[in-house]
Amino acid sequence: GFGLGMLVLAGWSLYVARRDRDLRVRVYDNGLVVTRAGDDRVIRWDAVASVNHVAMQSLRVRRGPTHLCTLKTRDGAATQFSDATLQNVAGLCERIQAGTLDPLLRRVAARLQAGERVTFGPLAVTSQGVDLGRGIVPWVRVGAIREADGQIALRIDGAWRKVGAAGRVDNVHVLSALVAKAGADG
């Protein structure tokens, strides 16, 4: 029940805190280096397949949101950063999103140009528009994207429509760039 769940969560938190007590991240123009327990892992921006950034409200009101940033590389490896073991994860994730935007956007644009569908969690995009599961909404009807209260929302025909939990939508920064470009072209 609830007690067992809390015990498992507490155990996992202790494990992660111990594992990441010496965690260091260095950001460079072409990627970053993650050092854990003396082992370096180099992650190039062009090797990243997805970035997911979630801000969760802490149970401790004064502390503010807790950030979790997850990178997945094209070889399937995942790397996570959280405020529990690293300072300023929100700023780190912003730098990661800035570094990965161009390579990810180029890959998505090539796939769209080839007529493919590209998924972003619970939604997908095509060259014609956004597919929310009930047909394609043309790009000209999609005005903006935002994250609020842990939800991703699109402005469609002037009204905000929730499309999914932020934790389920990878590469929001790429989706945001696609929406902005569609608005500029429309």
Language model features: what each stretch is:
Residues G1-G5:
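Hydrophobic alpha-helical transmembrane segments
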Residues M6-A10:
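Helical transmembrane-bundle signal
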Residues W12-S50, L105-V137, A144-R146, Q151:
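Conserved beta-hairpin
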Residues S50-A114, V140-G186:
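Acidic, Ser/Thr- and proline-rich intrinsically disordered linker/docking segments
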